[in-house]
Amino acid sequence: GVWAGGVFGRVGCGQGQLSAFSCDVKLIWKTKVSGEVLNIAKIVEGIVVVRTADGRLSGLDVTDGKRLWLYEQSVPALIVRIHAGVAIERGTIFGGFAAGKLAAVSLSTGIVIWETIVSQPRGSTELERISDITSSPVLDDDQVCAVAFQGRIACYSLAQGNLLWSRDISSDKGITIFHNY
């Protein structure tokens, strides 16, 4: 997909290549990433944050495309092919992954701050065990919320990842927080 940030336009393609172009469409840099880019990358504090279909999250230098860090985790044999974006707040990237995993990762270093499971995979077949987080996590005050396909919705504290509340509600579309004051 095409995405923009600052004065650059960038293109992610299915073959795992990411390119940066100037506003006058001159190539600035191109780089290989670990897999197919299925969502819009984000640019924060000079770092391009990109998710790939193989369950990895990469931080790239916005000026030259060089990889600064890589967060990776295993991917089950069967997943939902909807790859959620990430939410970024207070120098932390919040991302939902396959098998119901929600992770908080340092924007500057890629080091895991905390990880938790929103919904445990369960069932007797691979299809029944799909519990992927299929939408971007939602931030609200000091909590991050995520919902899993065939699973549950849950909210956690931003800082430590402590469970604040959860309900057995499944979704493949995501969640919205609405304050009814």
Task: For the regions a language model picked out, list residue spans one by one.
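Short loop/turn segments that connect beta-strands within beta-propeller blades
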Residues: 22-26, 61-65, 106-110, 157-160
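Post-signal-peptide, soluble extracytosolic/periplasmic N-terminal scaffold domains
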Residues: 1, 7-14, 20-22
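Extracytoplasmic beta-rich repeat domains
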Residues: 1-3, 28-44, 67-90, 115-140, ...
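Structural signature of WD-repeat beta-propellers
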Residues: 6, 13-14, 52-53, 97-98, ...
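Tandem repeat domain/solenoid detector
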Residues: 55-56, 66
